[in-house]
Amino acid sequence: MANLLDYLDWRGDLPLSGDPFNEVDNLILAELSFVDFGGIVPGPGAGAAVPLGEAAAAYFAKTEGRPIDMGVLVPNQIPEMLRRMAAAPRFRDMQLSGFVDHLDTEKAEQFAALTIVCGDGALYLSFRGTDDTLAGWKEDFYLSCMREVPAQKKAVEYTETMARQYPRVKLRLGGHSKGGNLAVWAGVFCPLAVQRRIRSVWSNDGPGFHDEILSLPQHVRLEERIHTIVPRSSVVGMLLEHEEDYTVVDSSQQGLMQHDGFSWAVKGPGFVRLHSVTRQAQLCDQELRSWVQGLSETQREQFIDSAFQVLEASGAKTLTDLKADSFKAVGAIVRALKDLDKETRDALLKFMSILFRSNLRMTLEGLQEETEKTLRGRKAAKPPVKKA
């Protein structure tokens, strides 16, 4: 299957003036905010925008001589994506500004964003999804029990700030994973004058929202401009509620790993579309929702705090830390589990069991589909037997 990198090779020479902004461009710019442009791209109102080609050169000069590890679940293809963007006429002259990267491990706050001046009369405000930090993942889980998490509030403030910095310019908002949720939240809760300037909002496998958010007038006003894209075995993107229609796309991965945007199949200026998410993804969604809805908001918050207390008992600050010394981490986690009360421990083990079973079922379902596809292809390619 072709992916984002292939798209940059095949269509990177086509300017936006002749080939308009599309859903694949959106995902590329959503992934771009995972790059650490600190010291390269100015913050909001802090200086002139930097051409993407120059920013890429400065980034690779800064990281020269050392491997670029994006983290356990952040795609390691992102630096290569940046390299190809810098060589592509479609992207290299785009301007970057408004880079923000905020992390507070004590308060479980993680927020990062980047503004791209696309050159077609619109900006793309790219909100970073959940990164490698445990604080970021904890805030992600808080989406299920809090009316507003800190990153959502910061996303609204960021959108207002960049709208003031670029008056009368049309806006696109987007992100991958939690970044997609932040993009929609910012679009819904920004001032009406700013919302009227929004051309589109892109949620790439981002979690949804509580029911009461979907019925708000400001969400209804924006609904037709929200584009939600999920892979065929989506789990993250099916969490909570989506009022808007969503597009299902094919992926080269199986199970939970389909969350990786670099696994999404690209054809021409769009993704390879499917009719619906898989049956196992639907069952996983139902099982997770049923489990979550069985807990009060207070119980959910206590569960999240306990779960991350167990992970942090290993001394890890990131998923990479957990992976680097997994033997030590597992020992610390097991000891921390024993210290939990039985009710919390049972809830945590049940949640892990649901995820494990669901991922296994979705993986097996995907492998079965691939096998059937291969067999059909062989049958179609087999020459007919001539009759004697």
Per-range role (PLM):
Residues 1-25, 29-93, 98-123, 127-157, ...:
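Alpha/beta hydrolase fold serine-hydrolase catalytic domain that processes acyl esters and thioesters
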Residues 174-179, 183:
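Gly/Ala-rich beta-loop-alpha elbow adjacent to hydrolase catalytic centers
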Residues 183-192:
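Short glycine-enriched nucleophile-adjacent loop
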